[in-house]
Amino acid sequence: MSITPEEKARLMKEFATKEGDTGSPEVQVAILTSRISTLTEHFKSHKKDNHSRRGLLMMVAQRRKLLDYARAKDEGRYQDLIKRLGIRR
């Protein structure tokens, strides 16, 4: 249900704003989006896993907060991010 360290490193490299960037909203949203999509696939075969569903809802809420922050800081970067990730908004 979690993402591999290689996948996480790839996302950090792809969405980083500068070398060694691990904490920018873009990187955090990309990692959360990957984890959310992994959990969504998990729920297709484990419909009654409510414990993990709670974790999914918390991840979605955290991503929403980070996206709101990114939008408030720089609308252009926000639009680019949701386009690159394919997030509906």
UniProtKB/Swiss-Prot annotation:
GO terms for molecular function: rRNA binding; structural constituent of ribosome. Pfam families: Ribosomal_S15. GO terms for cellular component: cytosolic small ribosomal subunit. Signal peptide: none annotated. The keyword Ribonucleoprotein applies. Keywords: Ribonucleoprotein, Ribosomal protein, RNA-binding, rRNA-binding. One of its GO terms (biological process) is translation. It comes from the Bacteria. NCBIfam families: S15_bact. Part of the 30S ribosomal subunit. Forms a bridge to the 50S subunit in the 70S ribosome, contacting the 23S rRNA. One of the primary rRNA binding proteins, it binds directly to 16S rRNA where it helps nucleate assembly of the platform of the 30S subunit by binding and bridging several RNA helices of the 16S rRNA. Forms an intersubunit bridge (bridge B4) with the 23S rRNA of the 50S subunit in the ribosome. Belongs to the universal ribosomal protein uS15 family. This is Small ribosomal subunit protein uS15. The gene is rpsO.
